[in-house]
Amino acid sequence: MGESNEDIDQMFSTLLGEMDLLTQSLGVDTLPPPDPNPPREEFNYTVGFKDLNESLNALEDQDLDALMADLVADISEAEQRTIQAQKESSQNQDRFALLRASDGQGTASGGYGASAAAIDVSHHEEALPPPPVEPMLDLLPPPPPPPPPELLSKEEEEAKAKADKIKLALEKLKEAKVKKLVVKVHMDDSSTKSLMVDERQLARDVLDNLFEKTHCDCNVDWCLYEIYPELQIERVFEDHENVVEVLSDWTRDTENKVLFLEKEERYAVFKNPQNFYLDNKGKKENKETNEKMNAKNKEYLLEESFCGTSIIVPELEGALYLKEDGKKSWKRRYFLLRASGIYYVPKGKTKTSRDLACFIQFENVNIYYGIQCKMKYKAPTDHCFVLKHPQIQKESQYIKYLCCDDARTLSQWVMGIRIAKYGKTLYDNYQRAVARAGLASRWTNLGTVGTPMPAQPSTVSSGLKTGTSQPNGQMPQAIPSAGPPLQEAQTQIETTKDEKQGLGNHSPGATRENHRPKSSLPPPPPPVRRSSDTCGSPALPSKVKGPGTCTFPHPPENFLPPPPPPPPEEDNSGLLPPPPPPPYLEEPPDFVPPPPPPAAVEDSALPPPPPPPPCLSQEITKSSPLPPKKPLVPPKRQENQGLPGAPGNSEQDFMSDLMKALQKKRGNIP
């Protein structure tokens, strides 16, 4: 081994000499001393790797962990040295680059006074050569580190591989040493959930896992609860407790359980501190003020009690019942709570500190609630608390049982003992629980804020419907006078789109007008029709009788009721086409306006407008100024028009006659 080491040293020294010559020929000032040093150290280090197996075989008695620690330390040192060397080389490169850049800028500024072409040429000449030179000069320092691994690459790779394997093995050993338990947690709904808990997890971490699994509200009252059925005791896990350590104290065949429950008394002191610090004043006034204490005073009281130089323990003292060792008898004694433990007043002594006797200290005990102590141990009441060492899992004389008179006293003593035992840690646990609950509430609020509020489609839809149904498109004023019949007629018009069914009860009149134009006489002009729209229907029957004697060629002026318009053929030849749209618009007002005086018929020869059916029918029924020449048609119309809203068989007969006359007329005209 010695000879091989010397040969390698000679080779490495010759290599370094050649590198020095190269650097001198290039005229670059590198730092030779730092460059050769790291590889030599690495080389010596690799030699140590070769001797590692021999040393391990020779020194089997030595501790493997100590050797591994030394090995890891050597590796880390070598890595740090290589990193430092690389940093130094990079710094040198940066310096060279800055110097060259400054030189280039100086030359460029000096030649700026010359012509533009000369400036460009000089700039290119000065700027272009440096870039190729920079990489060459910059690459020279890095090469020294790579050559040694090339020469000793196999050995170094083997050594590094071994070191990495050892590191992984150590990490796996550490991970394997971590205690892990599968815990079955009982829920308040009698269901269970299994969790994998390791010794690095605290009760707070387990609670967070349960919050994620159960999706509960994450308030501060949720806690892990420990129950001992054999001893009939139970307690709350503190958030800072190690769950695995506590469960490791259980026996293998134990019936103990871990529950996930809400307990309001867990942090009751932080919600109402006055009930624990100011409740034992002995005056009713103080109790009343305690009940009315505001949030600021509560916060001030908590800061004074938990955030000072020392923790203030509630001043609790009073008579409690103590269970005698190995017996079911209880003795009443006067106990006092102090930060170090519980003290009692011996018989015949006073409450002074020198006369007090120590009952128990809180360092190595946990506090539990008693379950059915009155039945099992003949306790005076069921309000009992128990103090025992966590490793005691069966009945023992070292378990202390104390009984209180009421539940309020019990809660005060239990909370006071917890404050004396855990101190400010208890307050820190509460603050973390509040922060966790606040975070959960914010997440839930973010999920609920984006939900759309339900709209009121009924009101909106009703408004839209009324808005569309009330106006008739062309005569909105007829809405109030028409009433429900008009709305029904309008809905029929929208759905069926039939002109004849424009109005519910007056649809037959519209059909009559469509069929009455069979008469060869021309209808009155459009203005007369509009005036007739306003005329009333009751005056029609008296005027209808008059025109019965009139001849066809000369219609009388007083004859209003007879059929108004001629056949559709004559309507097509009519000179006034605009009236058709107004009749539809003027249909509603036919019911309301009074009948105006009949207008004189001047344009008897003019043809009537083509599409007046709904409005014209009502106009004719309301005394149209120009009556038709047919004497037989008016009496039929008088019967039906005298009561426009009353349907009957006469209307059907009249309609059939009109249809027949219209068919004949159409057949004769072509």
UniProtKB/Swiss-Prot annotation:
Subcellular location: Cell membrane; Cell projection, Lamellipodium; Cell junction, Focal adhesion; Cytoplasm, Cytoskeleton
Function recorded in the entry: Appears to function in the signal transduction from Ras activation to actin cytoskeletal remodeling. Suppresses insulin-induced promoter activities through AP1 and SRE. Mediates Rap1-induced adhesion.
Tissue expression profile of the protein: Ubiquitously expressed with high expression in the hematopoietic system.
PH domain sequence ranges: 313-422
GO CC term (a single one): plasma membrane
Region (Disordered): 449-653
InterPro entries in the record: GRB/APBB1IP, PH-like_dom_sf, PH_APBB1IP, PH_domain, RA_dom, Ubiquitin-like_domsf
Lineage: Eukaryota, Metazoa, Chordata, Craniata, Vertebrata
Domain of life: Eukaryota
Modified residues (Phosphoserine): 55, 532, 537
Entry protein name: Amyloid beta A4 precursor protein-binding family B member 1-interacting protein
SMART domains registered for this protein in UniProt: PH, RA
PANTHER family: AMYLOID BETA A4 PRECURSOR PROTEIN-BINDING FAMILY B MEMBER 1-INTERACTING PROTEIN, GROWTH FACTOR RECEPTOR-BOUND PROTEIN
Keyword terms of this UniProt record: Cell junction, Cell membrane, Cell projection, Cytoplasm, Cytoskeleton, Membrane, Phosphoprotein
Gene coding for it: Apbb1ip
Protein family (similarity comment): Belongs to the MRL family.
Membrane topology, as annotated: Peripheral membrane protein
Subunit annotation: Interacts, through the N-terminal Pro-rich region, with the WW domain of APBB1. Interacts with RAP1A, PFN1, VASP and ENAH.
Keyword Cytoplasm listed: yes
